[in-house]
Amino acid sequence: KSVLNNELFLTLLNSTIGDSSFKVLSALSEAPIELVPAMYWWVTNKLWHLNSKPAIERINHRELLEIVMHRIISLDPNYHYGGAYRFFGVFYSRIPGVEINQSKTYFEKAISSNENYFGNKVQMAEFFYQKSENKPSFLIQLQQVINLDASIHTEMMPENIYYQKRAKNLLNQQDTLFE
């Protein structure tokens, strides 16, 4: 809810014409770059919450999630190490009826936007490779992350250490994940 309570957003919202849902979507689609962090974390947290819900919940929120993340891509595509691309990689692997290659395309964009951020590769393995039942690529990608030095890029070090541990956990679960 942080972005919805932001003064800058509320000013934009109040100047928009239409019913409440249309106003929110319109205001989000025109949000300025200053709102990128608030929008990113709001929608990212919303997705992680929705991932534990039935697929219909993700479908019901699809328009909102896509509008916000496409706005972020238009303003700051590399925000949080290609986070909007990574978001779509995860999201499109979890929406029924969406071609799984859309997930792959977005994960590849996330990785190319910041190859040093391990989360892009680990989430690609966890969501895309698992969904597409590509165990060899899953194993290779996770092992590559484990073999990297997480301390080289100090600004990413805490998250890279986390994702190395996540990669190890996923490798330990491979038999369950690929039954």
Question: Where on the chain are the PLM-derived regions?
Answer:
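TPR/TPR-like (Sel1-like) alpha-helical repeat modules
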Residues: 1-3, 104-105, 129, 136-152
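Conserved structural position within tetratricopeptide repeats
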Residues: 5, 73-74, 108-112, 147
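Alpha-helical adaptor scaffolds
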Residues: 77-113
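Structural signature of alpha-solenoid helical repeat scaffolds
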Residues: 30, 35, 57, 76-77, ...
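Short coil/turn connectors between adjacent alpha-helices in alpha-solenoid helical repeat scaffolds
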Residues: 49-61, 93-102, 131-139, 176-179
